[in-house]
């Protein structure tokens, strides 16, 4: 056995979720103000963002690039070290989704309207106007796709992974709320439940709205071109407002009528349609060239990635190029980090950090690699073959590049119709998913498996749509890109704090694991009766104890007559030393949701103390002077659970469902293998409690001196 520690998680059980007026109100006012300014003073808004982006690029361009690089290194280090074995959930938890389903969801997460746009727009742009060197050369062609893979590749997913790990770790392993603020508890403590936490969530919310608006703006412009080609609907404000209205309607229907499952099913179909488009382009296009280029792109990306990820162009800085590409993409990833990170955390509960990192860095990028290589190289091949009309469309009006490429292939009009359908569905599902996360960030005390109220989802979908339209009016896609670069800056500092808090929590858990190992060793000795105060059982008695069934009545009697008195005796003695102790007797309603075994109840000893008392206790027991040190004084818990188990059988005999026994099991708080104290005396239980209490004190002493 080992100790249990409360993680100061701010348990919200029994507390009704409510609107966070501060986060909701201030965020809504900021976004509404920008929207109104874009309508009534578009030139002023354009000039303001021009100046702000120039300043941000000059003074913080290096910071964005270094931040993304640091995120990549950070998550890889987590995966390769002992931290990689830690689960996003208790040690005994299992993944909510099968490996195949989880991989499929990660794969699909790399798909969206924006990649349909940039898979052609960026390679064409980089080929004709590269950041350095001459355009429309063989070298420019190779670099064009490499730059696109770099901007759309593992860099951003490392950022998503960082936030996803932190959210999953604190929500599912530390039992905190699934919010951005909860990831900073190791640094800010209970301050995150006040104004500091509100500020953090506001940064995430406002930045996310602008990131989503940029995605929706790109989608609106591209889909408008598709509607013109298929249905003859003119490009302009009316069609764009119609598309935005469609996203709001879909979000409303999804929130009010509960058709989320239907939308998700269509999204799954959409993934296969997108893959069909890529396969069709590969087969009906210049197949051998595309396959050769795919292999070459992989090699170029792998060899050049270390250089590209730290490239700031200090000696010949292409400011306009940096703002339009690298800085925009890095800011875009940052604004989306909280939203995608929350999705990744939700689907990865029960996975280890190592599995999570490997999955998020490889599976979405696999799709990006294939899609960008096929479509990007196809576009470059058309340009190099002398297709002047395609070149003009793809470079001058990049939103029409995808349709122009498909139109050059067999069954072009049918392919365009499929691409339009795929784009529309990706567009509305992105809006709906974004509104859902915005609603969650606007709530207080929201359980991790519950979503925000319907009207909030509709509100945020509407406001985001309004922001998208007004900013398109003020300056088109370019102003949305500029706004993203600016709005990402506040949340970028939050990301640094998230990484620091996660690292601190993981190091603390590692120290705790060392103490736990000693405690388990002591517990195993106790089971054989060799520890102080215990009588060694004969091997015959120990074997009989293993196979004899224990009824619930007998187990309850042992709990009441031996375990609880032992806990009370130890608690009383600790109170005499100035500590606060409490005995909790709970029934089956206290069942651990992460344990699928039948649970009958539990008895717990909870011990806490002021930092001053703990300082004196550590100094006395460990002979370690720690005056003035910071003590991570979590509550000590010794919990005995009544668990129903099948009676062990061997050979050809199988147990019937009624062949069960009850264990009085002491199990670590983080999960793992517990042990049975059914036949222990009260004295043995008391000694076991003290064994782990001493380990707990040792752990506090170690962490207080290390910090």
Predicted regions, residues:
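Extracellular/periplasmic helix-exit of transmembrane alpha-helices
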Residues: 118-130, 281-304, 365-396
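Helix-loop-helix module between adjacent transmembrane segments
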Residues: 14-25, 29-39, 72-77, 111-116, ...
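Membrane-water interface regions at transmembrane-helix termini and the short interhelical loops
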Residues: 10-16, 41-56, 75-96, 144-151, ...
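N-terminal alpha-helical transmembrane segments of multi-pass membrane transport
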Residues: 2-140, 256, 506, 593
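Flexible loop linkers connecting adjacent transmembrane helices
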Residues: 5-14, 47-53, 80-99, 124-147, ...
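Transmembrane-helix boundary/entry motifs in multi-pass membrane transporters
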Residues: 13-22, 57-61, 91-109, 145-154, ...
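Loop-to-transmembrane helix boundary motifs in multi-pass membrane proteins
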Residues: 16-31, 189-198, 233-252, 256, ...
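Helix-loop-helix connectors at the membrane interface of multi-pass transporters/channels
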Residues: 4-18, 177-195, 219-242, 272-277, ...
């Amino acid at each position: 056995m080992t100790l249990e520690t409360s993680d100061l998680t701010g348990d919200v059980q029994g507390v009704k979720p409510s609107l966070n007026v501060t986060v909701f109100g201030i965020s809504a006012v900021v976004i509404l103000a920008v929207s109104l300014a874009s309508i009534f003073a578009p030139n002023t808004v354009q000039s303001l963002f021009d100046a702000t982006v120039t300043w941000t690029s000059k003074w913080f361009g290096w910071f964005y690039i270094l931040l993304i690089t640091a995120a990549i290194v950070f998550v890889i280090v987590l995966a390769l070290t002992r931290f990689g074995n830690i689960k996003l959930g208790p040690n005994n938890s299992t993944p909510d989704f099968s490996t195949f389903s989880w991989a499929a969801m990660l794969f699909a997460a790399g798909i969206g309207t924006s990649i349909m746009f940039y898979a052609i727009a960026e390679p064409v742009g980089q080929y004709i106007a590269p950041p350095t060197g001459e355009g429309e050369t063989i070298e420019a062609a190779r670099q064009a796709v490499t730059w696109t893979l770099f901007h759309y590749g593992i860099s951003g997913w490392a950022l998503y992974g960082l936030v996803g790990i932190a959210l999953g770790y604190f929500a599912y392993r530390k039992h905190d709320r699934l919010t951005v603020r909860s990831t900073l508890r190791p640094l800010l403590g209970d301050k995150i439940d006040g104004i500091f936490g509100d500020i953090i969530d506001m940064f995430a919310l406002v930045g996310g709205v602008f990131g989503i608006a940029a995605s929706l703006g790109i989608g609106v412009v591209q889909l408008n071109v598709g509607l013109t080609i298929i249905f003859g609907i003119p490009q302009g404000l009316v069609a764009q407002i119609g598309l935005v209205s469609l996203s709001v309607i879909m979000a409303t229907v999804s929130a009010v009528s509960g058709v989320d499952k239907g939308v998700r099913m269509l999204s799954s179909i959409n993934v296969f349609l997108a893959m069909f488009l890529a396969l069709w382009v590969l087969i009906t296009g210049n197949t051998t060239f595309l396959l050769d280029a795919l292999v070459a792109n992989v090699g170029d990306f792998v060899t050049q990635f270390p250089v590209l990820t730290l490239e700031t162009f200090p000696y010949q800085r292409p400011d306009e190029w940096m703002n339009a590409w690298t800085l925009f993409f890095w800011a875009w990833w940052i604004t989306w980090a909280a939203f995608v990170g929350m999705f990744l955390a939700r689907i990865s509960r029960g996975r280890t950090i190592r599995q999570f990192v490997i999955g998020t860095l490889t599976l979405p990028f696999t799709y990006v690699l294939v899609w960008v290589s096929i479509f990007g190289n196809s576009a470059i091949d058309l340009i190099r073959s002398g297709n002047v009309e395609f070149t003009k469309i793809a470079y001058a009006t990049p939103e029409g590049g995808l349709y122009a490429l498909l139109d050059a292939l067999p069954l072009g009009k049918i392919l365009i119709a499929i691409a339009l359908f795929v784009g529309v569905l990706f567009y509305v599902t992105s809006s709906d998913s974004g509104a859902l996360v915005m609603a969650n960030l606007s709530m207080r005390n929201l359980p991790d498996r519950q979503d925000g109220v319907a009207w909030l989802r509709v509100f945020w979908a509407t406001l985001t749509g309004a922001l998208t339209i007004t900013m398109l009016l003020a300056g088109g896609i370019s102003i949305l890109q500029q706004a993203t670069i600016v709005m990402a800056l506040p949340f970028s500092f939050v990301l640094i704090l998230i990484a620091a808090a996660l690292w601190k929590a993981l190091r603390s858990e590692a120290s705790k694991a060392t103490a736990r190992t000693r405690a388990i060793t002591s517990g195993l000795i106790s089971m054989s009766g060799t520890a102080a105060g215990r009588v060694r059982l004969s091997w015959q008695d120990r074997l009989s104890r293993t196979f004899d069934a224990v009824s619930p009545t007998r187990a309850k009697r042992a709990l009441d007559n031996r375990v609880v008195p032992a806990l009370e005796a130890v608690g009383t003695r600790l109170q005499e030393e100035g500590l606060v102790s409490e005995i909790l007797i709970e029934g089956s309603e206290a069942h651990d949701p992460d344990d699928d075994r039948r649970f009958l109840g539990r008895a717990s000893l909870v011990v806490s103390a002021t930092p001053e008392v703990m300082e004196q206790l550590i100094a006395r027991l460990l002979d370690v002077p720690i005056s003035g040190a910071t003590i991570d004084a979590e509550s000590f818990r010794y919990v005995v659970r009544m668990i129903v188990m099948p009676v062990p059988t061997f050979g050809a005999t199988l147990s019937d469902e009624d062949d069960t026994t009850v264990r009085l099991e002491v199990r670590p708080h983080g999960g793992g293998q517990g042990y049975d104290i059914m036949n222990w005396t009260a004295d043995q239980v008391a000694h076991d409690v003290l064994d782990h209490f001493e380990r707990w004190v040792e752990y506090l002493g170690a962490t207080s001196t290390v910090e």
